[in-house]
C-alpha cells in the first residue's frame, strides 16, 4: 500500500510527456474514478491516505504504450451513457461527442434521422 499522492504523482510523471498536462490529468481522473471510486475532489482530500491499487502498475504500463484508458477500463462514457469497449470496438472520442452535441443543438427543432455507417461496433 502506498499513499494516494504517490499514485497521483507517478501517473502524471508518465502520462504528461505523452499526452500533455491537461489530457494526463483528465486520464488520471477517469482512471482513479473507475478503479478506486474516487472523484477528483476525493483524490485531493485523500491524498495522504494509504491505498491498495492492484491494477496501478499494469494499467500504467499499458497507458505508457499508448493504449487508450477506455480499453484498459473496458468502459467508455459517451453522451451520458456508459458503453462496454474492448479491442474489437472503436472507442468513442470526445470530438465525436462534441460534434453530435453541435448537430443536436443546430437542428433541435427538427426531427432527425441518422445512419451509422462504418463505425465498427455500431
Regions flagged by a language model, labelled:
Residues 1-73:
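N-terminal auxiliary segments of SAM/dcSAM-dependent transferases
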Residues 58-122:
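SAM-dependent Rossmann-like transferase core, predominantly class I methyltransferases
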Amino acid at each position: 500500500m502506498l499513499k494516494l499522492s504517490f499514485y497521483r504523482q507517478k501517473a502524471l510523471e508518465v502520462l504528461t510527456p505523452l499526452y500533455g498536462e491537461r489530457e494526463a490529468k483528465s486520464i488520471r481522473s477517469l482512471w482513479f474514478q473507475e478503479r478506486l471510486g474516487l472523484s477528483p475532489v476525493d483524490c485531493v482530500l485523500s491524498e495522504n491516505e494509504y491505498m491498495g491499487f492492484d491494477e496501478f502498475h499494469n494499467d500504467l504500463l499499458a497507458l505508457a504504450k499508448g493504449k487508450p484508458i477506455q480499453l484498459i477500463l473496458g468502459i467508455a462514457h459517451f453522451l451520458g451513457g456508459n458503453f462496454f469497449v474492448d479491442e474489437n470496438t472503436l472507442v468513442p472520442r470526445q470530438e465525436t461527442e462534441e460534434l453530435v452535441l453541435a448537430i443536436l443543438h443546430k437542428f433541435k427543432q427538427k426531427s432527425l434521422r441518422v445512419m451509422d455507417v462504418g463505425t465498427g461496433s455500431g
